[in-house]
Structures are given as structure tokens and as C-alpha cells.
From Swiss-Prot:
This is Protein jagged-1. It comes from Mus musculus (Mouse). Keywords: Calcium, Cell membrane, Developmental protein, Disulfide bond, EGF-like domain, Glycoprotein, Membrane, Notch signaling pathway, Repeat, Signal, Transmembrane, Transmembrane helix. CDD domains: EGF_CA (cd00054). GO terms for molecular function: calcium ion binding; molecular adaptor activity; Notch binding; phospholipid binding. The DSL domain is indispensable and sufficient for binding to NOTCH2. The gene is Jag1.
Length: 1218
């Protein structure tokens, strides 16, 4: 075998470098992909050329076989546009190439796939057309400059192939030699699609914010939209006409507009009570006038200036007159006689009557209209060094940071006491800090951070490995040196061709090509505009290293392939579903009307009534949105197994092997190359030929004297049989034909292409031609028609088959959700209210006197109190009372709040005007000590005393309650008045009707130091209510449930509501006996008198015992509301309802009067105790009956609770005990 020649294509390392550089500079070099061919095997048994000669030039005279030398085989490739009738001439428009000498007569390179010597790579910088014609020639190298090379065999193949990483295997089985090869088309990095012309490189900068999916579609990052994802998605509802944004979620208003959505115009400066439809207008609201809408035409209704039930009359713009009721005067009826009588000034403030009512001069430490606001002693902050000030009563407290201490955080704290230093020699205290003297190798304030020796050592993004007292730099590719400081020069080998200048870069190089050359090594001389990559009539301009398409006005993109959405960059106004108006300087009106693109690139929109539309489709398209390409292959125009490829209003036939022509109607003449030797006659077959040999020659091409069969006679594993005058091939399964060259089962059966895709056979593989709207190797991936974001205002895009539909967010409509629905169109606001349209809603601006969402509600007058305007129906607290505005009238509950607690020896007076802080009496101190505690008293005002007495009860509008407290749960310094004040401030009293006046007074118990007697009384009671009983029941319920956040309630041990003692029903006997004695004295009948006296005393003793039973019955009436949870009725138990007595009187007072104590023997007791859970238990107990034996009523006794009963003295009284 001759030594291989030095010709051939560059080695594999250089080709990889070329591919890398093209990928990095795809925009510059213009290459979008490459066609690859790899030789797998060669069979040339006799070592012959196509013309029948031997590669070595000498043939054995006996058997006519070539004996001297084998062929030096190499291959040439020519790639051109698809030809239905293949011609050997013409340029290789898609590229050409060759291999070096890779073998002899017969060789097999399948085991060494990936070897660079048997591969040919043809880069292309145009949109890959998928259909192609390939010419492959096997040549014999002569290895000298005189003798030309000779062709061994050539093959041609026309077909279709999609870009893929998978190889397709093709075979040449006719002629002198047989060879097998594989092909594929791959796209360069960042290029996608069937044509490798969809460019997508992820980026996140000014020019775009997107990633790329597997099909090369730009997937916008969240918040971005547009073809290049460089248009920010504004805040939902942002006016497309008056707002814009540069960042997602923003909404920047144009000049003259404002609001969250830039949909509210800015009124004229100084416009007070006016609105606008366009900027700088001032359209007055109802009852307002003037140029700036500052003249009130209904001053009375707007301001309600007349106080104290004065009548207001409008007399002109901003003018009114008040008619005051008796006892009031002034322009607004604000002057009241004797305004200070109600003592309105709190905290020892002094009241002075003025022409407008009164003014309060507050004592030190208090401020406000009524001196009710405590002055903040922490303003300004008295705490130094960042201390937090806590306001106290007439003082403050500083919470200091850890570095400071002292009353005002003025002293430096010694931080070294906490031993913060970890790996240090010593700790030194500093002002507001400390210093640690670290040991070698440690750093940080606490010497707890190990020093990183790698810090700042390695350069050029090298990684550093920290060592013990050292480091080591691991350099990235392209750098060297101890610190990776030296850039490796990739230009040292001068890789650039044709005068290109090499520019060294990091781990790579770049060739700057002269004019007319391009490619990664300046090896290509290509006109980038041939063929024209620009679409839609755009003109192509060739540049030194790229091309430029000048797009028509309505198209954009690198190749002018995308419809331009003018409204993404320019403010548009929606006219209807088909048309939007955009600003333009090219028309006299300054407006240009453009399509909304709802019908896509293949149709024109026609507007219909009711906001609907229809699409008028271009030729070759149909469907609602003109998204379906009409199938021109439906009539099966391709013959003889040809595959029809549908185009736009056209089709193309891809012929099977052996056929050619526009409709594959012509059988290819396989005898055109005269394959039969030594006078043999060639007969053409389908994709094959047959030689009728003469003069004793045999074989496929009449080239043998010995046998009709050789290794290349039968293809695809067929077995050849010599039948003397001819040969016969026995084909394996799946193959047929004279030489087993026709596939019986096509790789397209069954059709592997989905969704209407067309399958094209390519050797032992197939290629799917997908319908528009589908992608992928077998057409299973639906093209994302929703990218990038065609729907406005947060509309949801529904992706279809080559179409999309926008499902609009609430409040928007239109094919792309650009139309904001006007909810005010139905006039939802009542009584002349102004309707303001909003996103998916509206707002009604009500005229005076109306309120509600639609202004249907008629509102009352507002109230003016303490200089504040209170809306009708509003509630607020005033000391211990609750007030409410009711149609201009202030209604407050009438609970007497009592004297206010205060602190003695304060620098400022805490009491209201006219009062002073007086020390509490010793017997009023409930939880000792009460040092410094006082009460606000006035010498002119006498303390309010309740009208309740020891025998008062509900029918007297009174109640007497005794509270027993657990003092261990109470804070020192509490007085009786403190406890009483907290009772008056309970929420249950704030809901009492304003028609009643409630008084609560408290006194300490004389017999027990943990008890307080509370008297509740009411005045102005109508016949239809009993507030005292209601308040008493609520207090008992509050205590029993431990409800509320009051510490007072938590400390209550028990509550006793006392009854009035029953009067002895024998009191009427005294006058009766006197009358009898008088009659006896007059009649002088001593015997009769003695008999009569004895007679009357006997019934008296019976009458004396009767009240006990009645008294027992009287208990039940008071307990109708309280159910005994542990009560059980035995067989001998009398039902409780039998003890009811409607005439019984109820008394709830506990007293220590000696006369009452003597009558306690006639009283019964009801008692409820707290065990683990609150329960009510009624106990009825007497010490002794007249007979001398103790009695217990079975209905009111429970053994489980008797263990907790009070002493005999306590049980002689009848009470509620909680």
C-alpha cells in the first residue's frame, strides 16, 4: 500500500477548537450548524476503478484479477440543494470536503467511530432546508503530481434530515465497490429548530431577561415579556395609555397623571373639592363652586357648624347662620353659660369660662383640651448611648445597651468580666467596647476566627486551598503561575488564516478576519446574503462577518420573521378587537391604526358587532385564527412510494431510492455509468441494474472468470448462489430485490410521526416533517404559542395547536385582555353619587347625607365634642363611660366614675382642675403599704353616697355585694377606691343603657381585712328595666368564669350577694293584745281576761314557726337563674319549684349591725364556692329548731360541698357565695 499523502482536512483537535470558537462567536461567524459524514466501511474486492482498470494498473493474465497493489482510498463529498433528478455537475452549494487516505481495497472502521480521519464536517451559515442531495465519491490516490487521481465509485442520495445528535446510516450497494457511511446534522450552540436558524442565548441584562427551552424558545423570566423579554410587565391594572414601567410590577405615570395605576388625572393646582377627567381640570363636586371648587354652597350640610342643637341656614357660598336654642349663643352656638360647672378639666386642671365655652389650664405634667394626656417624660430622650427610655409616672427609666450602665446609661460597663475573648492573651476594657489581644493565627473581636491564608492570594478567579500557614492556587484553564497570574498565549501557533489577526483571550483565541473572509479561522469566503436569509420582503446587506436585514415596518427580528407588536413599545389605544391606535409622526392626525395581530401572521382581522371578530386567511391557511396550513398533500400526488412534504399552498415529493422527478414518476437509469465490463449489456432495474455478460465473463459487473458471486454481489447480508449463467441472492428478513437492496418493511411503518407529521425514510432511519405548531424528533412537542406573554393585564394564555387564547383576569376583556371593563357603565351609584371605575370594581363617592358601598344608606348628622368631629354611629370611651354619636346627639352611659387615684409628692398635679391629691385614710388602704398613694378630692364637691341601706334590695334599685380577695395575688399599695374604680371600668357597665345613672360605692369590711362591701344603685329607672339586677348577675358570671384580663377579677376568692333579713310576722300581736287587755279591764272580767290571754298566746307560738318555712321558700325565687350542677333528687326529695313564693322579698346585704345579728336565726343561706372549677351550691342550714334538734332541708344540702361550709356564724346568714 502506498504511503498516504499529506493532504486532507485539519485534525480533530483543531476542528473541536473551530466548533468552540464558532459557538462563542455565533453572531460573528454566522455559522448555525454543520453537516457531518463519517465513512464506516469499504468493499472493493478486486481493487478496481470505476472504469474497470486496476488501481495499480496491472491485471493477472490468467484470471484477470488485479495483483500488484491495493487502492489508496479516500472520499470526496458534495452537498447541494435537493434535486429530484440528480446531476453530477453544478456547484456544491451547501459545501464540500474530503478525507485523507483512510484505507485500501476493503476496510471496516465501525469499531473506531469518532476517528477524525474518516469524518467530514461541512459547516453552514444558512437556514438548514432539511431536504438535500448528497454526492459521495470514493477515489484512489496516485501519490504523485503527474498521474491524476482516479474514481473508484460514486453514490448519490436525496432525502430529508432534521438536526439531531443521532446518526443515519446509508449504503452504496451498486457498482464496482460497496461502501457504508452515516450522516447527521447538528446545530451549533444557542441555535435551535429544524433549520438551525432559531438563535437563543440565555441572558439577564438590559437587552433581555430570558432562558431557552429545548426547542430554542425564549422563556421570559418572571415579570418580563416581549419578543426579547426586555419589556417589563407593569403592575396589574396599570393604564397602558398613561403609565409605563421599566421594572416588573412598577407603574410610572406620565406627566399629569397619578394613582397606583396611573389612571387618575392630576387636577388643577389648588383645586379643593373638585375632580378631573383630563389633567389640570377642576370639575366641582356636589354643593361646591368657584374656580377652584373652594366655595361651599352647602356649608351647613358639609361642616354642621352649629353646636348644641343649633339650627343652621345657608346664606351664600361659604356663609351660614346659626339659630341657637335657649341658653346658648355665639356664631356657632358654642357659648354656654356656666360651662365650668361640670368640672370638665381633669388632673387638677383649672377651668376658665371663655366666650367659646371653657379653657383648661393644666397642672404640671398634664396637657390636652381637658388635661387628660400625661406628658411624656421621655421626650426628649434622657438616656445616653442608645439607651431606651421607658416613661413612668413623673419620671422615667433607662434600659441600657450591654456596654453601658447607670441611671441614664452614662457609665461604661466592663465587658471583660464576661470573658468574651476565646483565643487571646488578654482582654482590655475600652469605652463602650473591649479589645482582645489575639494569639497568632486568630482574629475577630473575640479571637474566635481562624485567619484564612488564602485571602487575596490567587488571581484570575483561581480557587485557593488553605494550608497550614500557607496556601495553594488551583488555576482555571488558560492561566498558570504560583498565583495564576500568567495568561497562556493561545495565539503562539498562529492559527488564523488568510491574513487574519489573532487576538489572545482567556483559554481561547479569536481571529479578526479581513474584509471578505469569515469563519473561526478566517477560512471561509462566503456571501452571507446568498441565499437570502431575510424574510417578508426584507432587503439583505452583506457585512464583513455578518448580514443585516432591513425589516418592513410591521416586522422585526434578526431575519424579519416576527410580527412587530407596536404596543409593547408604544402607547396604544384599543379601538376594537382588530384595531389599535398608536402615536405616529408619519400621519397628519398623529395616529396610525395597526392590527391587533389576533389573526396571527397568516390572516387579516375583520371587526364584527359586539366586540367580536373574524379572520380572513391568506392562501394556504384556514382555521379560526388562520393557524392551520391547508394540507396540499391530501390528494397523494407523489408516486412510486414517494413522500409528500406539505408547504404553504404547495408541496414537494421526496422520492424513494431509484425514482426521481417532480412526482417521482421517473425510474433512475442505473445503467447511465456503464457498470458492465467486457462488453456486457446493462439492463436498468429499480434502484439497481443487471449485466448480461458475454465471452465467459461472470459476476455482477462481468468482472470475473470464476464465479457469478463475490462479497459485494448481494447486499444487506444476502447470500449469493452461482447458477452458472447468472446469480441469485437469498435475502434476509426485511429485504428484497435482485441484490437485496429494497427494504421490505419501511422504517416509517407504522408511522412514528405524531400530530400529522410526515415520515421520510432515510436509509435505515427516518425523519419527521412536523406540521406548523409542532416540534421535536417525532412531532410530540407543541410549540409554545404563549411565549412570550401575548396577554396583557395578567391574562392567562391557553396554548393551542399553532394558536393561543387569552383568558382575561377579572375586570378586563378583549382578545389580548387590553380592554379595561368599565364597571361604572351600569350607573351603580345612587342619589347622584360619583362613580369611579377601578380594576374589576368601582367606588362610589357619596354626596353629604349618604353612605354605603352604593350610597344607598342615609346617614345621620355627625357630632362635635371636645373640638373633634365624630361620625354618626361612632363610639368612644370617656373615662369609665362609653359614648356614641346618634344623629348629631352625644349619648353616654351614666356611671359615676368616682375620685381618681393619684400619687403624692409629684412635681405636677395629676388631678383634674379644682381637685388636689389627698392622702388616703389608713382604713382605706386595702393592700399595705399605701405610702405615697392618694385620691383626687375637691373641697367644694361632696362625695357621692349611695342611697342603698342595709335593708335595700332589687325593688329598691339597690344591691349589696361583699368581695373576698386573695391578697397574695394583689400588688401592694391598692386602696379601696382603686378596687372600686376598676369595678366601674368593667366592660359590662359600658353597655348599660344611657337612660340610667349608675353609682358604685365601696367600703372596707370591719370584721375581715380581706373583704370589701360594694353598694350598687341606680336612678332614673323606668318600669320596664332593672339594671342593678342585670349588673349584679353579670359581675357574678364574670367572677365565676374568671372572664376578662383584670387582675382584680383573678384575685377574687368569693362573692356574696346578701338578702335583707325577713321581718317577724308576729309584730301585729302587740296592738292586738293591748286592745284585748283594754276590753278586759273595762269589763272587769279577770277570769275571762286570763283565759283570753292564754288563748291568744298559743296561736302566737304557731305563728312564730311559720316564717321559717316561708323564709325557706323565699330562697328559691332568688335562685331561679342559677342551676345547681351537683343537685340530685332522691326519692324523698320535694321538687324545688314547690318552694317558690312570689310574695317573698329579696335582700342582698351583708351587715354587722347588732340588731340584724340577733335576727340571723330566722335567715337561710345560699352559697356557691369555687373548687377546682366554679360551681354554684345552695346551702340551707339552721343552728337549732325550737325543738332543740338541728334541721337540714334535703333539697339544699349536698355532702360533697359540706366540707367547705363556713363557720356557724357565717352560716347563720343567707347569702350568695361565689
Amino acid at each position: 500500500m502506498r504511503s498516504p499523502r499529506t493532504r486532507g482536512r485539519p485534525g480533530r483537535p483543531l476542528s473541536l477548537l473551530l466548533a468552540l470558537l464558532c459557538a462563542l462567536r455565533a453572531k460573528v461567524c454566522g455559522a448555525s450548524g454543520q453537516f457531518e459524514l463519517e465513512i464506516l466501511s469499504m468493499q472493493n474486492v478486486n481493487g478496481e476503478l470505476q472504469n474497470g482498470n486496476c488501481c495499480g494498473g496491472v491485471r493477472n493474465p490468467g484470471d484477470r484479477k488485479c495483483t500488484r497493489d491495493e487502492c489508496d482510498t479516500y472520499f470526496k463529498v458534495c452537498l447541494k440543494e435537493y434535486q429530484s433528478r440528480v446531476t453530477a455537475g453544478g456547484p456544491c452549494s451547501f459545501g464540500s470536503g474530503s478525507t485523507p487516505v483512510i484505507g485500501g481495497n476493503t476496510f471496516n472502521l465501525k469499531a473506531s467511530r469518532g476517528n477524525d480521519r474518516n469524518r467530514i464536517v461541512l459547516p453552514f451559515s444558512f437556514a438548514w432546508p432539511r431536504s438535500y442531495t448528497l454526492l459521495v465519491e470514493a477515489w484512489d490516490s496516485s501519490n504523485d503530481t503527474i498521474q491524476p487521481d482516479s474514481i473508484i465509485e460514486k453514490a448519490s442520495h436525496s432525502g430529508m434530515i432534521n438536526p439531531s445528535r443521532q446518526w443515519q446510516t446509508l449504503k452504496q450497494n451498486t457498482g464496482i465497490a460497496h461502501f457504508e457511511y452515516q450522516i447527521r446534522v447538528t446545530c451549533d450552540d444557542h441555535y435551535y429548530g429544524f433549520g438551525c436558524n432559531k438563535f437563543c442565548r440565555p441572558r439577564d441584562d438590559f437587552f433581555g431577561h430570558y432562558a431557552c427551552d429545548q426547542n430554542g424558545n425564549k422563556t421570559c423570566m418572571e415579570g418580563w415579556m416581549g419578543p426579547d423579554c426586555n419589556k417589563a410587565i407593569c403592575r396589574q391594572g396599570c393604564s397602558p395609555k398613561h403609565g409605563s414601567c421599566k421594572l416588573p410590577g412598577d407603574c410610572r405615570c406620565q406627566y399629569g397623571w397619578q394613582g397606583l395605576y396611573c389612571d387618575k388625572c392630576i387636577p388643577h393646582p389648588g383645586c379643593v373639592h373638585g375632580t378631573c377627567n383630563e389633567p389640570w381640570q377642576c370639575l366641582c363636586e356636589t354643593n361646591w363652586g368657584g374656580q377652584l371648587c373652594d366655595k361651599d354652597l352647602n356649608y351647613c350640610g358639609t361642616h354642621q357648624p352649629c353646636l348644641n342643637r343649633g339650627t343652621c341656614s345657608n346664606t351664600g357660598p361659604d356663609k351660614y347662620q346659626c339659630s341657637c336654642p335657649e341658653g346658648y349663643s355665639g356664631p356657632n352656638c358654642e357659648i354656654a353659660e356656666h360651662a365650668c360647672l361640670s368640672d370638665p378639666c381633669h388632673n387638677r386642671g383649672s377651668c376658665k369660662e371663655t366666650s367659646s365655652g371653657f379653657e383648661c389650664e393644666c397642672s404640671p405634667g398634664w396637657t390636652g383640651p381637658t388635661c387628660s394626656t400625661n406628658i411624656d417624660d421621655c421626650s426628649p430622650n434622657n438616656c445616653s448611648h442608645g439607651g431606651t427610655c421607658q416613661d413612668l409616672v413623673n419620671g422615667f427609666k433607662c434600659v441600657c445597651p450591654p456596654q453601658w450602665t447607670g441611671k441614664t446609661c452614662q457609665l461604661d460597663a466592663n465587658e471583660c468580666e464576661a470573658k468574651p475573648c476565646v483565643n487571646a492573651r488578654s482582654c482590655k476594657n475600652l469605652i463602650a467596647s473591649y479589645y482582645c489581644d489575639c494569639l497568632p493565627g486568630w482574629m475577630g473581636q473575640n479571637c474566635d476566627i481562624n485567619i484564612n491564608d488564602c485571602l487575596g492570594q490567587c488571581q484570575n478567579d483561581a480557587s485557593c486551598r488553605d494550608l497550614v500557614n500557607g496556601y495553594r492556587c488551583i488555576c482555571p484553564p488558560g492561566y498558570a503561575g504560583d498565583h495564576c497570574e500568567r495568561d497562556i498565549d493561545e495565539c503562539a501557533s498562529n492559527p488564523c488564516l488568510n491574513g487574519g489577526h489573532c487576538q489572545n483571550e482567556i483559554n481561547r483565541f479569536q481571529c479578526l478576519c479581513p474584509t471578505g473572509f469569515s469563519g473561526n479561522l478566517c477560512q471561509l469566503d462566503i456571501d452571507y446574503c446568498e441565499p437570502n436569509p431575510c424574510q417578508n420582503g426584507a432587503q439583505c446587506y452583506n457585512r464583513a462577518s455578518d448580514y443585516f436585514c432591513k425589516c418592513p415596518e410591521d416586522y422585526e427580528g434578526k431575519n424579519c420573521s416576527h410580527l412587530k407588536d407596536h404596543c409593547r413599545t408604544t402607547t396604544c389605544e384599543v379601538i376594537d378587537s382588530c384595531t389599535v391606535a398608536m402615536a405616529s409622526n408619519d400621519t397628519p392626525e398623529g395616529v396610525r391604526y395597526i392590527s391587533s395581530n389576533v389573526c396571527g401572521p397568516h390572516g387579516k382581522c375583520k371587526s364584527q358587532s359586539g366586540g367580536k371578530f373574524t379572520c380572513d386567511c391568506n392562501k394556504g391557511f384556514t382555521g379560526t385564527y388562520c393557524h392551520e396550513n391547508i394540507n396540499d398533500c391530501e390528494s397523494n400526488p407523489c408516486k412510486n412510494g414517494g413522500t409528500c412534504i406539505d408547504g404553504v399552498n404547495s408541496y414537494k415529493c421526496i422520492c424513494s431510492d431509484g425514482w426521481e422527478g417532480a412526482h417521482c414518476e421517473n425510474n433512475i437509469n442505473d445503467c447511465s455509468q456503464n457498470p458492465c465490463h467486457y462488453g456486457g449489456t446493462c439492463r436498468d432495474l429499480v434502484n439497481d441494474f443487471y449485466c448480461d455478460c458475454k465471452n465467459g465473463w461472470k459476476g455482477k459487473t462481468c468482472h470475473s472468470r470464476d464465479s457469478q458471486c463475490d462479497e459485494a454481489t448481494c447486499n444487506n447480508g444476502g447470500t449469493c448462489y452461482d447458477e452458472v449463467d447468472t446469480f441469485k441472492c437469498m435475502c434476509p428478513g426485511g429485504w428484497e430485490g435482485t441484490t437485496c437492496n429494497i427494504a421490505r418493511n419501511s422504517s416509517c411503518l407504522p408511522n412514528p410521526c405524531h400530530n400529522g407529521g410526515t415520515c421520510v425514510v432515510n436509509g435505515d432511519s427516518f425523519t419527521c416533517v412536523c406540521k406548523e405548531g409542532w416540534e421535536g424528533p417525532i412531532c410530540t412537542q407543541n410549540t409554545n404559542d404563549c411565549s412570550p406573554h401575548p396577554c396583557y393585564n395578567s391574562g392567562t394564555c391557553v396554548d393551542g395547536d399553532n394558536w393561543y387564547r387569552c383568558e382575561c383576569a377579572p375586570g378586563f376583556a378583549g382578545p389580548d385582555c387590553r380592554i379595561n371593563i368599565n364597571e361604572c357603565q351600569s350607573s351603580p351609584c345612587a342619589f347622584g353619587a360619583t362613580c369611579v371605575d377601578e380594576i374589576n370594581g368601582y367606588q362610589c363617592i357619596c354626596p353629604p347625607g349618604h353612605s354605603g358601598a352604593k350610597c344607598h344608606e342615609v346617614s345621620g348628622r355627625s357630632c362635635i365634642t371636645m373640638g373633634r368631629v365624630i361620625l354618626d354611629g361612632a363610639k368612644w370611651d370617656d373615662d369609665c363611660n362609653t359614648c356614641q354619636c346618634l344623629n348629631g346627639r352625644v349619648a353616654c352611659s351614666k356611671v359615676w366614675c368616682g375620685p381618681r387615684p393619684c400619687r403624692l409628692h409629684k412635681s405636677h398635679n395629676e388631678c383634674p382642675s379644682g381637685q388636689s391629691c389627698i392622702p388616703v385614710l389608713d382604713d382605706q388602704c386595702f393592700v399595705r403599704p399605701c405610702t405615697g398613694v392618694g385620691e383626687c378630692r375637691s373641697s367644694s364637691l361632696q362625695p357621692v353616697k349611695t342611697k342603698c341601706t342595709s335593708d335595700s334590695y332589687y325593688q329598691d334599685n339597690c344591691a349589696n355585694i361583699t368581695f373576698t380577695f386573695n391578697k397574695e395575688m394583689m400588688s401592694p399599695g391598692l386602696t379601696t377606691e382603686h378596687i372600686c374604680s376598676e369595678l366601674r371600668n368593667l366592660n359590662i357597665l359600658k353597655n348599660v343603657s344611657a337612660e340610667y345613672s349608675i353609682y358604685i360605692a365601696c367600703e372596707p369590711s370591719l370584721s375581715a381585712n380581706n373583704e370589701i362591701h360594694v353598694a350598687i344603685s341606680a336612678e332614673d329607672i323606668r318600669d320596664d328595666g332593672n339594671p342593678v339586677k342585670e349588673i349584679t348577675d353579670k359581675i357574678i358570671d364574670l367572677v365565676s368564669k374568671r372572664d376578662g384580663n383584670s387582675s382584680l377579677i383573678a384575685a377574687v376568692a368569693e362573692v356574696r350577694v346578701q338578702r335583707r333579713p325577713l321581718k317577724n310576722r308576729t309584730d301585729f300581736l302587740v296592738p292586738l293584745l293591748s286592745s284585748v287587755l283594754t276590753v278586759a279591764w273595762v269589763c272587769c272580767l279577770v277570769t275571762a281576761f286570763y283565759w283570753c290571754v292564754r288563748k291568744r298566746r298559743k296561736p302566737s307560738s304557731h305563728t312564730h314557726s311559720a316564717p321559717e318555712d316561708n323564709t325557706t321558700n323565699n330562697v328559691r325565687e332568688q335562685l331561679n337563674q342559677i342551676k345547681n350542677p351537683i343537685e340530685k333528687h332522691g326519692a324523698n326529695t320535694v321538687p324545688i319549684k314547690d318552694y317558690e313564693n312570689k310574695n317573698s322579698k329579696m335582700s342582698k346585704i351583708r351587715t354587722h349591725n347588732s340588731e340584724v345579728e340577733e335576727d340571723d336565726m330566722d335567715k337561710h343561706q345560699q352559697k356557691v364556692r369555687f373548687a377546682k372549677q366554679p360551681v354554684y351550691t345552695l346551702v340551707d342550714r339552721e343552728e337549732k329548731a325550737p325543738s332543740g334538734t338541728p334541721t337540714k332541708h334535703p333539697n339544699w344540702t349536698n355532702k360533697q360541698d359540706n366540707r367547705d361550709l363556713e363557720s356557724a356564724q357565717s352560716l347563720n346568714r343567707m347569702e350568695y357565695i361565689v
